[in-house]
Structure formats: structure tokens, C-alpha cells
Amino acid sequence: SNERNVVLISPRRIGKTGLIHHVFEQLKKSEPETKCFYMDINATRNVNQFIQLLAKTVVGQVDTFSQSAFRKILTLFSSYRPTVSFDEFTGIPTFSITISQEQQEESLKHIFDYLKQSGKRIYIAIDEFQQISEYPENSTEALLRSHIQFLPNVYFIFAGSSQHMMSEMFLSAQRPFYQSSQMVNLSPIDVHEYC
């Protein structure tokens, strides 16, 4: 509610993901127009894979599916060879794009512009966020920060299990995300205290 991005740090198996999904469900109940997205980037190995996962997660999911929304998305992302598939059970479309190395920054900008132009309140949880520090591209943090800071209607939850890496990313004055988000540490609940 304070309109700040949040950094959520806890060891694995403490309940970060469950907490994020619970908060998203509460947000959707209290604000039905709000859009909430969750993506786990642990399996991504570079910026290109990150951008493709982000596109698959959010593109086409912000608005209700219509022909005009479909055309708008295809036009906006036409240079990335968009492909559309439909979930066989729900019929909900899923978009994916092919991005060349030269198109990475431009495609990320287009995705964030798409979110900004929606005008809707959007929350995006990026789990295992420390993974971006392992990418071979050294400027990933700066690239993301340069876009994220100009999204007035999009809020991020940066979740991670590596306390050292996450703290370094958000508390070191030399890093792009320095003091950009509110820090929250989760620790195990004492069984004796709550049972």
C-alpha cells in the first residue's frame, strides 16, 4: 500500500512463494482490476531468457482477450516474430516472442511500455531474483532498473533465497537497485510459539 517495490528474502522452503500467492489473491479480491503476475527466474541463464519469460508471463494477460487487444499486441511485438498458442482447457492465449541479441534492450522497453500503457495497477513478483547477477551480461541490473523506475502503475516484488546476494544487490551503494525497494526478511516461525 506504500507504493514501493519490495525485496523479500528468506531461505528456501520458508514460504516466500506461498506468501506471494496469498498476497496476490488478497489483492485480486480487494481490487478486481489489479493484475498480478509471478515468475520464477531460477532456470534462466541470460537476459534473453529473462525477457522471453517476462513476455510469456505478461504479454496478452493484462487486458481481456479481444481482437483489438490481439492486433495491438501483434503490432507492438511484430519485429520479434510473436507466436500465439491457446491453452487447450481454458482457451486463454499465451504469447511468446523470439528475440535476437541486438533486440534485447528494445524488446524489454516494449514489454514495459505495454504494461505502462495499460494504465492498470500491476504487481510482478520475480522469484529467485538474485539469478540476474549470474547472467553473462554484466549490465542486467542497470538495464532493468532503468526501465522499472519509470513504471508508475507497476510494482515489483523481488524475492530471493540468497541473503548475501540480495542484500548486496539492494544495499550496496555501487549497485543500480540501491535503496530502490523496501526490504523484508522472512525467517522460520517458532513452532512452540504458534502451536
Please annotate each region the language model reported.
Residues 1:
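N-terminal pre-P-loop "Q-motif" helix
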Residues 39, 184-186:
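Hydrophobic residues at beta-strand termini and immediately following loops
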Residues 27-31, 148, 173-174:
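Active-site catalytic pocket residues across diverse enzymes, especially alpha/beta-hydrolases
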Residues 32-36, 152-154, 179-182:
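Short glycine-/polar-rich loops that comprise or flank the Walker A/P-loop
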Residues 5, 94-162, 171:
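Conserved Walker B catalytic segment
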Residues 163-181:
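Short regulatory helix/loop adjacent to the ATP-binding pocket of P-loop NTPases
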Residues 186-195:
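Conserved small helical "lid"/interfacial subdomain of P-loop NTPases
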Residues 4-5, 10-14, 18-123:
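P-loop NTPase nucleotide-binding core
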